[in-house]
């Protein structure tokens, strides 16, 4: 499509954060265009595992992730569309003495942050999840752990944004020039003037920031995921994570299981090329089957890798850029799917002159200019 000559706000990046930011702006009656270098909802948000859990998140960020789950529930209601959101709780498992000690310590830390957990071992664990391997010696259950369908979520957000009057366009950002009243953006689809720019480019945040003369270091991850054929429901719609990390597992309502957790593939974000590392893929599958043996009976349909990124301090980068009126950043640093709707609402509010929520203060992009 042809870009308009000018608009109030341009959101760069059509993932979970960019689209929710734009949706809130459009529903508030603001002019907004979302641009992306490729088809919308193609990269990180589209190729992740759909996990919206608390138990596998960093303790110091738990308050923000808890609010992220609140926003997911609001999103379900506000979209009035099927996004495959399931909230049946989740298990974080331990398989060794070291795991169990870490699980107890982690549960204590999370409980101190207000997360409600139930400790399970012995018969209580077998009764709750008979499908877990006998090597799983203990688990904590969190009723807030959830998941959603990345495919359905993206489709619903794009539909809702367009219905609200927003625009989504394939247009890669290639440069910018500051103006008295905003910015002139150069893109692969032409030039567009705007008052506000929201950078919601995920793994490409460092590249976009550099166009504005800002250095935001980003560590690229190339996460491996797999999906099985549809099999009979046996996991009670729970999310499973592992105290040792690099493990997420869930069974969607259609019966297919999604295996994730962060085993690494290979890729280069500038060329866009990415590929599976077969050793890492096999390690991921063995790990999953060691926790849930029934997975061995399912055929693997497809495996893939997707880009995600982490800031050098493993903190979100969210809010207005000091000294640069009209420039905002919305970078979640890992687990963006979980916290995305919260960040989107917060950044949209900031664009409209509202203060950033207390839970996100301290994560502004100004810390990189210090």
State the predicted function of each range.
Residues 7-33:
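N-terminal Rossmann-like FAD-binding beta1-loop-alpha1 element of flavoenzymes
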Residues 26-46:
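Glycine-rich FAD pyrophosphate-binding loop
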Residues 42, 191-236:
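Central helical "cap/lid" subdomain
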Residues 49-128, 246-248, 287-288:
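Dinucleotide-binding Rossmann-like beta1-alpha1 core, especially the glycine-rich loop
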Residues 83-92, 118-122, 126-164, 265-270, ...:
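Helix-loop-beta segment of a Rossmann-like dinucleotide-binding subdomain
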Residues 140-195:
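Helical element adjacent to the flavin cofactor pocket in flavoenzyme catalytic cores
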Residues 230-326:
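Active-site lid/adjacent beta-loop-alpha segment flanking the redox-cofactor pocket in flavoenzymes
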Residues 290-370:
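C-terminal catalytic lobe of FAD-dependent flavoproteins
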């Amino acid at each position: 499509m042809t870009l308009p000559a000018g608009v109030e706000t341009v959101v760069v990046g059509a993932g979970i954060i960019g689209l929710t930011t734009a949706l809130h702006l459009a529903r508030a009656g603001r002019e907004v265009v979302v641009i992306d270098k490729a088809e919308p909802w193609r990269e990180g948000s589209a190729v992740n595992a759909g996990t919206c859990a608390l138990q596998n998140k960093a303790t110091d960020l738990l308050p923000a992730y808890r609010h992220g789950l609140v926003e997911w529930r609001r999103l379900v209601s506000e979209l009035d569309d099927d996004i495959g959101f399931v909230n049946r709780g989740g298990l974080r498992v331990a398989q060794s003495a070291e795991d169990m000690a870490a699980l107890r310590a982690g549960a204590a830390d999370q409980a101190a942050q207000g997360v409600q957990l139930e400790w399970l071992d012995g018969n209580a664990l077998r009764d709750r999840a008979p499908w877990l391997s006998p090597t799983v010696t203990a688990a904590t259950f969190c009723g807030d752990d959830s998941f959603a369908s990345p495919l359905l979520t993206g489709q619903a957000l794009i539909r809702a944004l367009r219905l609200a009057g927003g625009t989504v366009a394939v247009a890669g950002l290639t440069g910018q020039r500051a103006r008295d009243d905003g910015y002139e953006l150069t893109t692969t689809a032409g030039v567009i003037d705007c008052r506000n720019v929201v950078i919601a480019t995920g793994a490409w945040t460092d590249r976009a920031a550099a166009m504005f003369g800002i250095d935001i270091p980003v560590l690229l991850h190339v996460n491996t995921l797999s999906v099985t054929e549809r099999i009979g429901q046996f996991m009670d719609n729970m999310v499973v994570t592992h105290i040792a990390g690099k493990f997420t597992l869930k069974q969607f309502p259609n019966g297919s299981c999604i295996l994730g957790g962060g085993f690494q593939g290979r890729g280069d974000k500038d060329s866009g090329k990415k590929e599976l590392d077969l050793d890492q893929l096999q390690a991921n599958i063995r790990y999953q089957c060691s926790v849930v043996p029934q997975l061995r009976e399912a055929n693997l349909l497809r495996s893939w890798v997707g880009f995600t990124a982490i800031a050098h301090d493993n903190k979100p980068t969210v809010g207005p850029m000091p000294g640069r009126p009209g420039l905002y950043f919305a970078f979640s640093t890992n687990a963006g799917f979980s916290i995305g709707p919260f960040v989107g609402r917060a950044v949209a509010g900031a664009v409209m002159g509202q203060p950033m929520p207390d839970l996100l203060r301290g994560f502004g992009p100004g810390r990189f200019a210090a």
